[in-house]
Amino acid sequence: MQNNRYRLRYLPLFYDDLNQKLLYISDVLHNIAAANKLLDSVESAIKERQFMAEAFEPYESLCERQHPYYRIYVGNFVVFYVVIDEGEAGKVMEVRRFLYNKQDVEQKIW
């Protein structure tokens, strides 16, 4: 059986988004357990999607993009990623943003 796993790449902006949310939960809300649980859930969701990154409906953006965005819902948050075909090197699942689901997404992923 062929391994169809996409290579993973994370943008620094994703890490900034994630760290901001985790610090808020752990330091402001004083809930370290919830922050750790969120981190584990995000990591698991991304790893699960790595095998089928293009099997889900693309996000309908208001502007045309070279690579369509896909979403992974994790509780009240959304992970945004794109798939980039790098030819013989294979396909990359590039994880770009981690946003609260009530944020103005179009403004954040522009």
Regions found by a protein language model. Name each.
Residues 70, 74-110:
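Enriched for short, Lys/Arg-rich terminal
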Residues 22, 43, 96-99:
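Conserved protein kinase catalytic domain
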Residues 30, 47, 51-55, 77, ...:
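Generic structural signal for secondary-structure transition and capping sites
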Residues 1-41:
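Arg/Lys-rich, positively charged N-terminal/basic patches that mediate binding to nucleic acids
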Residues 13, 42-49, 72-80:
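A short, hydrophobic secondary-structure junction motif
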Residues 34-38, 57-60, 64-65, 86:
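Solvent-exposed interaction patches of small proteins and small membrane subunits
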Residues 46-72:
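A short, surface-exposed loop/turn module that caps and links secondary-structure elements
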